[in-house]
Amino acid sequence: MKGKMLLGLTAILMLTGAAVPVKADDVWKFDAQRFVLKEYTGTETDVVVPDTMDEGVPVKRLGTQLLAGSETLTSVVVPDSVTILDVGALSYDNNLSEITLSSNLINIGWNAISSNDALTELTIPASVCIIDSYAVSGCYALKKIVFEGACPLIGSEAFVMLSDDVVIYVPDDQIEEYKKVFEENNKNLNIQPSGKPAVLYSAEDYLDTENLTFDAETGSITGYNGMNTRLTIPESIDGVPVKAIGKRALWEDPLLGYVTLPEGLEYVGEDAFSITDTLKYVEFPSTLKTIDKKGFSSYRGFRLDLPDSLEYIGEEAFSYFSVETDLIIPEGVKELGPGAFSAASRLQRVFLPSSLEKIGDNCFSRSPITYVYMEGLELPEISDTAFDKCEYLRDIDLNEKCTKQQMLDVQALVDTMGLECRVWRNQNTEVEHAYFSVEELPDDPSKLYLTGYEEEAAKVRR
């Protein structure tokens, strides 16, 4: 009977021309398990994104291309419940002129606010920690960008294809930090003081101890039931030091974007953070020694800053990871386990320390590496499959003081893998200028050797 009454009321409203109210659930597709809005089917020009769905479940993410490609959308208000803008969430909207972002936003994803032709101003809330590559790009009408907090991590191409007239206003007490970051990214942008101090957040603001499960006997975090996107793990719980992140403690978390691990932590366990596809940055402590099997598998990080205390990177610890910067393994690491950096989709340059003793089976296999540098005079034990299917690998440079025999041994190894790669002795830091030339080998005139020059760091290959 109730259903018939509703149908009758709807018919009357349609006949009289009265508007039929539309519930949020009717125009938004929501994944309650991952707290993400995935689709919008409404026709409003001014959209206020709901902060809850499905009878009270908080909206934490705007999904991939959620409000992209609209010709009619003119304004969007993102509620304070939202902490993540996924890829292209607010992009390619030709008439979108006003965006109000969440005051709790942590991560502005790749291409998230791009190619919006009518957008003239944008305010980045103080809570934002990460702005990924191309996040605010191709908005040629944009004249004013205001940052309210400390300088976040900013992708190298985060602010590109903007008007020459755009001015970036930053807190007065943070201007040098912002200038440094933009200069490091080779962006010559007009940065001016905003006239206000920064609204600052500390790591302690993101503690969520009550939602962590903890094994006091082993000092291990064993699980997390909270909804933080930025999360700080405490140094101790109820007086017991946190020494480890246990097996699958935070794996497949749908919201984690920025994690601070505590001083005193020594071990990250198997699958601890694996398949956490929103994770963009980890602050590692100076005490960490081991990252075990698949500890950060599928890490799609903004960058990877491993600590000098690290000694062992386990089997597939960073397999399937995607990081757009160079991979620098810190001095102190002794072993890279099997498949440790396999199938790393954006990995191109790798720098290995003199402390390294072993590179395991398939360590870098199926990764698009083009260049490897080995610092040590004593070369590590290298598996004959370490660089298997690295079809783009062209150069491996050894320390300048390595012997010719070491160079030939590594060359023989890559030859057995069928790679079109040359091994060189390199990195002569005492040479100020070296120019390209080709000369014959004295013992075999049919073969040539090359001396090379790189503007940023002079090198001689021999």
Predicted regions and their residues:
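Sec/Tat signal peptide C-region and signal peptidase I cleavage site
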Residues: 20-24
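Structural signature of tandem-repeat unit edges
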Residues: 26-27, 42-60, 71-84, 93-107, ...
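Bacterial N-terminal signal peptides
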Residues: 8-17
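Helix-loop-beta element that forms the nucleotide-linked donor phosphate-binding surface
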Residues: 181-189
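Short N-terminal segments immediately surrounding and downstream of signal-peptide cleavage
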Residues: 26-35
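Positively charged n-region of N-terminal signal peptides that target proteins for export
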Residues: 1-8
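A structural signal for leucine-rich repeat
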Residues: 137, 157-161, 181-182, 385-389, ...
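Consensus positions within tandem repeat domains that build extended binding/scaffold surfaces
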Residues: 64-66, 86-89, 109-112, 132-135, ...
